[in-house]
Structure formats: structure tokens, C-alpha cells
């Protein structure tokens, strides 16, 4: 068993937007949704954008009017191919497969207490595996975990241990999480932000990146 220190960074993918999709019984990876309070005018900040909507190069933290303009531009480009639109849809796969559909999206009003409830439920999953002293909360949707003492305890590789946890999060809450594993906290964070988030989700719905000092020099 590898005795090298191992740390994990775990991020809940487009957390607020994913929760809103799940509450509507929609797939976060296939639903165009933005979390924003429309009652505050179109200058309000978009708190989260679903993974499906992000695939159109729409980032989070835009103001709502900027999102509206970006979607108008996307639909203008779609019309160059389609010539006309037969309907408006927020279903990502249908939009990909049918250029005659106008890209639409759901605007969900933020529900912070609900997001906190989901975050607490996921934190309880971490507590099933780790002592609280080894879990470092970075934000409502991101944690760092010192895996070092648990690899030997569970007789699992760091990858397999984190894979089990991400799968349990997905099974319990339907939220996809991405993770980075590294030989220090910095490398774990970089593995998550640069490697895991840019790779395709595997057949089990998981994204895990890994970096040690040698791989960091080689890949980055």
C-alpha cells in the first residue's frame, strides 16, 4: 500500500443549479437552468448555471441580462442553420439533435436554506468515512479531506476511496461531484479544477483527477 500523503478536494458540480434541477425531477446534466432572482431586475447576479447550459460557453456569475444576451446570440447562430424554430426547449440533448429548436432555459429563484440542507446531507456522507478533524470545509459545495490515514484503514487506493464517496453522493442526492487527488492540498485543488472538471464524466457519472509533483511538472 502506497504510504505517500494523499489529499482530496471535492466539488459539487454546479451545486445550486443541480439542486434546482433535481427538485424539478430534471437531469442537471441535460437541463438548461440558471439560478437567479428575476424579481431583482435583469441586473441580478446569476448564482449558478447548470452543466448543460455551461456547455454553451456560458459561465456562472454573469448578470441575468448578460445571460439573456448570450442566449440571443446563440439562437441567432442556430437560426443561420435552421432558418426557423419549431419550438423552444431547455432539454440539452434535444437541442443538440434538432437545430430547429430554440435554446431556452429555466430561471430558478435561489433557495439558500434548501441548498444548506443538501450540503448537510452530503457532509453526513463524508462523516461516515472520515473523522471531522480531517475534513476541511472550503465552502457550501467544496471540501478538502486528508486521506492519508484512511487508505490503510479501508485497504483501498485513494482513487477507489473517493470513487466510492462520489458514487454514494450521486446515489443519495443525484448530485454529480468532481474530485481531485494530490500529494498536497494545492495539487488536490489543481487536479480538481483543471483535470477533473475538464474531463468527461465516466460511465458511473464520476470525474476524478490526480496530480503528484512529477505529473504536475509534466502536465502543467
Specify the residue positions occupied by each region the protein language model found.
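Residues that scaffold, gate, or flank divalent-cation-dependent active/transport sites
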Residues: 1-140, 144, 151, 193-194
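Active-site-proximal beta-alpha loop/turn segments in soluble metabolic enzymes
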Residues: 143-152, 186, 220
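Long, highly charged, low-complexity intrinsically disordered interaction regions
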Residues: 157-220
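Short, surface-exposed alpha-helical recognition segments that flank or form part
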Residues: 114, 156-157
Amino acid at each position: 500500500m502506497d504510504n505517500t500523503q494523499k489529499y482530496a478536494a471535492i466539488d459539487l458540480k454546479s451545486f445550486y443549479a443541480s439542486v434546482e434541477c433535481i427538485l424539478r425531477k430534471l437531469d442537471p446534466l441535460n437541463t438548461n437552468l440558471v439560478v437567479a432572482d428575476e424579481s431583482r431586475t435583469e441586473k441580478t447576479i446569476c448564482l449558478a448555471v447548470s452543466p448543460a447550459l455551461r456547455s454553451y460557453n456560458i459561465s456562472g456569475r454573469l448578470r441575468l441580462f448578460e445571460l439573456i444576451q448570450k442566449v440571443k446570440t446563440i439562437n441567432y447562430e442556430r437560426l443561420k442553420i435552421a432558418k426557423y424554430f419549431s419550438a423552444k426547449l431547455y432539454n440539452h440533448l434535444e437541442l443538440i439533435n434538432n437545430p430547429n429548436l430554440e435554446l431556452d432555459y429555466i430561471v430558478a429563484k435561489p433557495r439558500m436554506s434548501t441548498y444548506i440542507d443538501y450540503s448537510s446531507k452530503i457532509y453526513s456522507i463524508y462523516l461516515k468515512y472520515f473523522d471531522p478533524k480531517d475534513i476541511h470545509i472550503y465552502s457550501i459545495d467544496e471540501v478538502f479531506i486528508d486521506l492519508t490515514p484512511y487508505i490503510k484503514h479501508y485497504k483501498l487506493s485513494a482513487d477507489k476511496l473517493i470513487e466510492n464517496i462520489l458514487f454514494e453522493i450521486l446515489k443519495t442526492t443525484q448530485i454529480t461531484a468532481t474530485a481531485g487527488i494530490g500529494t498536497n492540498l494545492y495539487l488536490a485543488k489543481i487536479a480538481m479544477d483543471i483535470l477533473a472538471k475538464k474531463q468527461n464524466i465516466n460511465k458511473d457519472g464520476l470525474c476524478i483527477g490526480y496530480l503528484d509533483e512529477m505529473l504536475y511538472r509534466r502536465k502543467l
